[in-house]
C-alpha cells in the first residue's frame, strides 16, 4: 500500500471466479476500509472462460459480502463497451455467438445495477464515461485503438481514460462519503492497466486508474 493508501489488486484475465479465489491473498491482508470492485468483462467476453450471467451474479454478491465481513465499504464500477471489430479479430469464433458482445456487457451492467440496489453499494459509471467519447476507431476514444495508441486493443483504457476514471471514482468517494484511508482496487486488467507505465501498481508516477486515484487523494489530503 502506497502513501495514499491505495493498492492496485488487478490481474489480467481474471473473472469473478479468480477474484473469489485470491481475495484472502490480495485483499484481506491490507485491511481496507474501501474496496472498489471492477470486474465482469472477462466473465462475459473471455472466450473459453466465460461465466454464465447467474453465476456472475452469485459471485459478485459473494465478493460484496466477503468485503463487508471485516467491515470494508464497497463501490463497484460498471463495465465499458469494447470495439467489436477488434474483439472479433482477437476471437474469430465469437462472431458465431448468437449473443453479441455488447449485449453480454449490458447484461453484466444490468446485474451490477440490480445488485447495487439490493446490496446498497454505489456504482461508478465507467461505462457512461467511456461512452461520453467516441467508442470506435477515433483518436479521442478512451479505449486504446490504432489511432490513439497504435494498438488494435479496443478494451483497455488509454492514460487519459485512466485519469478520468480515477476522477470519477474520486467524485463517488466524496459524494457517498466513503472511507478512503486504505483502498484496494480489486479487479481484472482494467484495474491492472496493461501497456501503461507502472502497470499493476499504484505508484506515484504510474498510469493505471488506482495510481491516478492515489494522486487525487494525496492532493486532497494536502489541502
Predicted regions: what they are:
Residues 187:
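Conserved S-adenosyl-L-methionine
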Residues 2-5, 14-183, 192, 203-223:
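Alpha-helical cap/lid subdomain in secreted, periplasmic
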Residues 197-201:
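Acidic/polar, solvent-exposed loop segments in beta-strand-rich repeat domains
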Residues 8:
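Conserved SAM-binding motif I beta-strand of class I
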Residues 11:
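Acidic/polar N-terminal loop/beta-strand segments that form early-domain functional surfaces
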